[in-house]
Amino acid sequence: MMYQQGCFAGGTVLRLAKDLAENNKGARVLVVCSEITAVTFRGPSDTHLDSLVGQALFGDGAAAVIIGADPVPEVEKPLFELVSAAQTVLPDSDGAIDGHLREVGLTFHLLKDVPGLISKNIEKSLNEALKPIGISDWNSLFWIAHPGGPAILDQVEAKLALKPEKLEATRQVLSDYGNMSSACVLFILDEVRRKSAEKGLETTGEGLEWGVLFGFGPGLTVETVVLHSVAA
């Protein structure tokens, strides 16, 4: 079990589950992300007005998924393939997101340059993850991006010149449920799968072959998972 990992942990548990499933024949790994972010709600503080941002964005949520290798035909139907996964800590980001356990409980503080730090470094993470499979067109991917908040999504979208529909599922989940920390990326995976089925698209990934899952959180830490969709 993992505790107090923050918003990037949805990617972390997928990476660890992938490793367990690949290295233990016949294994099936149950991944559960459960977040009660309401415990961070506090009254306004003159010294930490930034805490109001997180309190306005966050929400409670839980999601689960099963990870395995070598699916059993006619018994199991995979939804996505986890191709590769990596974690990195962004440079010059120490203290950008802080969490502390105090007498009043768990508190979080966010620096105003968090969206800029993420958007400035995201392309490097993409290149490292996707260069081995020859992808450099970010609009050719389906996107499972941890929402963070609207400012982060806006800056990432602008930095990578993404079409508005690329982050549509992420924005929908943020609007419906708020930032549920680690659980968000699993909600977004399901949203992409559901919309693809509703539209009758050829794959679970909006009709596309390749996708990327991003998780951002304290550190600043980025989890990157390369996804391959399957036939619908």
From Swiss-Prot:
It is an enzyme of class 2 (transferase). It catalyses: (E)-4-coumaroyl-CoA + 3 malonyl-CoA + 3 H(+) = 2',4,4',6'-tetrahydroxychalcone + 3 CO2 + 4 CoA. The active site is at residue 7. Its EC number is 2.3.1.74. Keywords: Acyltransferase, Flavonoid biosynthesis, Transferase. GO terms for biological process: flavonoid biosynthetic process; polyketide biosynthetic process. The keyword Ligase does not apply. It holds the Pfam family Chal_sti_synt_N. Pathway: Secondary metabolite biosynthesis; flavonoid biosynthesis. The keyword Transferase applies. GO terms for molecular function: naringenin-chalcone synthase activity. Gene3D superfamilies: 3.40.47.10. InterPro entries: Chalcone/stilbene_synt_C (IPR012328), Chalcone/stilbene_synt_N (IPR001099), Polyketide_synthase_type-III (IPR011141), Thiolase-like (IPR016039). The primary product of this enzyme is 4,2',4',6'-tetrahydroxychalcone (also termed naringenin-chalcone or chalcone) which can under specific conditions spontaneously isomerize into naringenin. Belongs to the thiolase-like superfamily. Chalcone/stilbene synthases family. This is Chalcone synthase. The lineage of its organism: Eukaryota, Viridiplantae, Streptophyta, Embryophyta, Tracheophyta.
